[in-house]
């Protein structure tokens, strides 16, 4: 949609813009695993007409440093998975710093919970310098952007961002997504 609007306005695409748009599409679709349709592939095929190294983009998006790999292990070992299929983890500044990473260098952990078969939706809470939490919210089954809207965020139906100002906000967000999944699965609180 964004690509078509740019074309309709007469803006000229160049190789750098094509690479950046391709990077965004690859990231937003989880490397073409979700939130896509034939239009996505049509746009990508047009982007390939520009001179950029699309293989390098994929390589850079799928490789990580040793510290990033260690944080990945931590996330997988410490992820809380609720009976509803909702998973979440809180990454504090101290934890992120212990792996010699910064908040911006943790985007790679967002897809990790998707590798666990019982996980239907997940959230990564990343503490910010101001003491609030950036929320990366993803789902395979339920629409989560309306929940994200209630926490100063938004995004796609299955991939959104939000903000939790306090740990109470974290609890509320977890309860909301968990409750929505429980309703979808016809579960009751007793089955938790």
Language model feature labels by segment:
Residues 22, 27-192:
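Hydrophobic helix-and-loop "lid/oligomerization" segment in the mid-to-C-terminal part
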Residues 1-24:
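A short, charged helix-loop
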